[in-house]
Amino acid sequence: MMVIVFYTGTHYNIVMHQFWEECGHIVSPVSRFTHYIISENTCRLVHFNVKGMITSMKIAAVIAEYNPFHNGHLYQLQNIREELGADRILVIMSGNFMQRGIPAIVDKYLRTRMALENGADVVLELPVYYSLGSAEYFAQGAVSLLDKLGVIDYLHFGSECGNLQSLQEIASILSSESDTYVTYLKEYQKKGESFASARYYALMQELSSEKAVLTKEPNNTLAIEYIKALMMRQSSIQPVTLKRQGNGYNALSLNNELASASAIRNFMQDKQADYVRLADQVPSSVYSSLMDNQEYLYVDDFSSILYYKLISSFHAGHDLSDIYDMTESLSDIFRKHLTEYTSFQQFCLDCKTRNVTFTRIARSLMHILLDMHQETANQLKENDYTFYAHLLGFNDKGRDVLKAIKGNSSIPVFTRLPEMLKKLDGAALTSLQADIYASQLYYGMQGQKYHHTPINEFRLKYNPC
């Protein structure tokens, strides 16, 4: 492993001598500027101040949705501080639309504040093409963004199994795409199995059933995709997993203080719900934020605009073939059931089949709603996924992280949309425009539902805490 040293002060010889005295390592310059490499057993980011005093910073990252932030998320951030010993925590967070194909229950800036008040130091936005992507695309986009920042030591994530070695073994098979695996994957897909089921049966040919079955759990699946993305990039970021506590990812019960985000959203959507029950499920600051800002959005709030989008597309002879992650068979299903349309959620249930899940349908409908195109997704992948980092918020500790990023990131970090619209072009600009459009639609629906002018994100700078 390596230690990367950044020195921007004066008296280089004196400072480097002091470093050698304190750390016992010979320093060899790798450029004529400020970067030096020192051999050691762990990867650390080391900074010198102008007086030559050494300060070190271990930075961990989390990829999250926080929809909303709850006790399980708090447990993870506390574990990162206490068990991993991280000095700073950076979060890559989905914006206003989630991987399940639903809108965020509260907007990205309020969720950023929740995170910063409960252990995060910096929050960056995951572009919408990844936040609304499959598990693989979601992970590839998020890991690409983290890797390009150039300062992250660890990627910390939850999993049902909590066994990093088993997850890495599966990720290795998936990333290498062995002939055996690929052959069986295609064979089971031809038999009508969903991708997830086909992958499970294909992995059974190379792994024990005890390990292959791990892919059937949602957090394990994302964990495997994170590890696979790190492997494919040959990233120096080290994966760390934490066994999920409390209710399962899809559980809808509030009978546990570590209830899932799904259970909390389901409870909040009930108009007869006693919100006092939420106080045991989320940190006190989050509870206060949710009670003070009751402008919640749900997928059915987008029912009318989705119906208009579908009927206008089909009426114009558009077969939806250019839509992101769309297939001809899925388009036919949508056309077939359109005459039965009553709401977004019910339409997903009507269109669900044995090998097409509710979530896959919901994501595809959001792709239609947000004019997300397969050509753009392909361009993003071909150009290594990410081109910018949108800063949603930070606290005082986060300033150190931002300074480190500024000196090491291969992509720009920005707080104001107008400045980036002027600087980006090509696929990068298309990606940012998709983010802007998604937020404008979200805030537009929020404004209509709660009878106020939509939030204008172009006037926002950042959300310090």
Predicted regions and their residues:
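Methionine residue identity
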Residues: 1-2, 16, 53
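N-terminal catalytic cores of NTP/NDP-binding nucleotidyl/phosphoryl-transfer enzymes
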Residues: 54-111
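Active-site cores that bind ATP or allylic diphosphates and position pyrophosphate for catalysis
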Residues: 126-465
